[in-house]
Amino acid sequence: MRVNVQRWTLYVLLLMSGARGNQQNEASIVEDQNKKEDNVNLESASISAHPEIAPASEPIQYKTAEIADAMQATDIPTNPAVLLSMVPREVMDLKVSESESSVCDSTIEEAECSAYEHLNEPADAQDKGNSETPERDTEQAKAEESNNTDSSKPLKVNCEERNITGISNFTVNILNITQDLMEFLNPNSSECTLVLFYTPWCRFSAGLAPHFNTLPRAFPTLHFLALDASQHSSLSTRFGTVAVPNILLFQGAKPMARFNHTDRKLEALKSFIFNQSGIEAVPGVVVTEDDCESPLPCAPTVGIDWLLVFSVIYVTIFIVYATMQTESIRWLIPGQEHEHQE
């Protein structure tokens, strides 16, 4: 029993001595690390203060493998002084001279410094700046051209102004069902005529009527015609009139332009004529109450649409006939089946 106790006490003493030895080793390692760090910090401070006297790069040697492992561990950040020591002295001197030449006092010599930096720019940057200047000028010129009105564009129609001497009443001529458009258009002349395709029962044509009635007074040197598209269906098909109201500008007997704007007011019509022909409107011409009366009506006319009546009658007759023939159709189908069986 005593022998066992002595053995256990011996084991405990050995363990305690080993632990003390490990603690002493660890303390010595920590002290060595602190000394190394202090030395490195002093070296980095001296190098940062005097970069021209930085020592040559030398490999760092450690006393023991444990200290080397501790210093080269991944959790310890790399010391910048060590990295600086690896840079050659010629490169350091060049960087220092460049930094000193580029440093400028912004509070005292700000203007002079900016001029100096501009002079020190490379030739490529100056060439780029010079090349960007004409590009900006061209972009500004394009923007100004796009902002100009259509009046600066070349005229599409060169209208010959008609002689208005002796004419006091300028109005719209309306074609009846017996007249032809070509009777009013002269193919051998360069005079321009504005032709309106309309229908009396269309409310859009009625809304345009007072503004179109005002145009002959605003443009006395032009001709103005209006025709009922339902009565002149051949002309509507010939000139591509699929909806009314439709306005075409003719030069002689040739259609030159079509009015496609949704705003069918007097100002829009004036702009259309001016942009196409270059003829300016007479100033001071406005829509009056008389323009709502004639020659084009300002209210849609109420009448009988005989085409619609004929269509309704035709559909009704077809339905009655199909109903009466239902029984005969039923008898035909079984007869055909018997023929196939025989």
Curated annotation (Swiss-Prot):
Keywords: Cell membrane, Cell projection, Cilium biogenesis/degradation, Glycoprotein, Membrane, Signal, Transmembrane, Transmembrane helix. One of its GO terms (cellular component) is cilium. Residues 323-342 are cytoplasmic. Residues 173-276 form the Thioredoxin domain. Residues 120-145 have a biased composition (Basic and acidic residues). Residues 120-156 are annotated as: Disordered. Its main location: membrane. Residues 22-301 are extracellular. Coiled coil: none annotated. This is Thioredoxin domain-containing protein 15. Glycans are attached at residues 169, 176, 188. It is found in: Cell projection, Cilium membrane. CDD domains: PDI_a_ERp44_like. The keyword Transferase does not apply. SUPFAM superfamilies: Thioredoxin-like (SSF52833).
